[in-house]
């Protein structure tokens, strides 16, 4: 789900996410073409660490849902996802990481998010208790960013998705020590 763009330092960036046009050449280099339909760009998390953790859960097949605040969408003039939308998900460096299709969207008060959705999000132990604790902390930071006060009844966008494409992760650069070992 879209979140505040984050800089390479892990500090929330006030800059914009890249555009679909910016990302398409990179996707095409990996042989990825997008299906017809509405395409947008989004990110998960509000720090480099959280972004990487959530993307790893998606890549592992554990995470198939994301939650965001209606207030955040309003503050950022960002539409609420709709079923069938394609999303290019970027990492904390604004590099494309994966492509998803939204399969379900429900807007509910924070205190009405279901255990089934919490499990679909795939974070922590998958329980509603874990979801509420961690998302309360996350949404509290989001509320601070947009000048709102968190509430048990704040509206949450619960979106489910399927992964269409995983963008290959770049290989780590070889170190001098690695080259010396390989030459032996």
Segments from the language model and where they lie:
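Mixed-charge, low-complexity intrinsically disordered regions
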Residues: 2-99, 106-184
């Amino acid at each position: 789900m879209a979140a505040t763009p984050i800089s390479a330092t892990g500090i929330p960036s006030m800059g914009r996410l890249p555009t679909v046009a910016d990302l398409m050449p990179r996707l095409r280099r990996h042989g990825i073409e997008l299906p017809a339909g509405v395409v947008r760009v989004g990110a998960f998390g509000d720090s480099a660490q959280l972004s990487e953790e959530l993307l790893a859960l998606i890549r592992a097949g554990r995470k198939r849902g994301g939650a965001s605040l209606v207030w955040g969408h309003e503050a950022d003039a960002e539409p609420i996802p709709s079923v069938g939308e394609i999303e290019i998900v970027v990492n904390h460096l604004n590099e494309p990481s994966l492509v998803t299709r939204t399969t379900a969207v429900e807007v509910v008060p924070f205190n009405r998010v279901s255990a089934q959705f919490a499990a679909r999000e795939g974070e922590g132990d998958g329980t509603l208790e874990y979801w509420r604790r961690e998302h309360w902390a996350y949404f509290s930071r989001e509320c601070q960013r947009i000048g709102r006060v968190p509430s048990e009844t704040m509206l949450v966008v619960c979106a489910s998705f399927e992964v269409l494409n995983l963008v290959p992760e770049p290989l780590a650069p070889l170190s001098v020590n690695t080259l010396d070992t390989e030459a032996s």
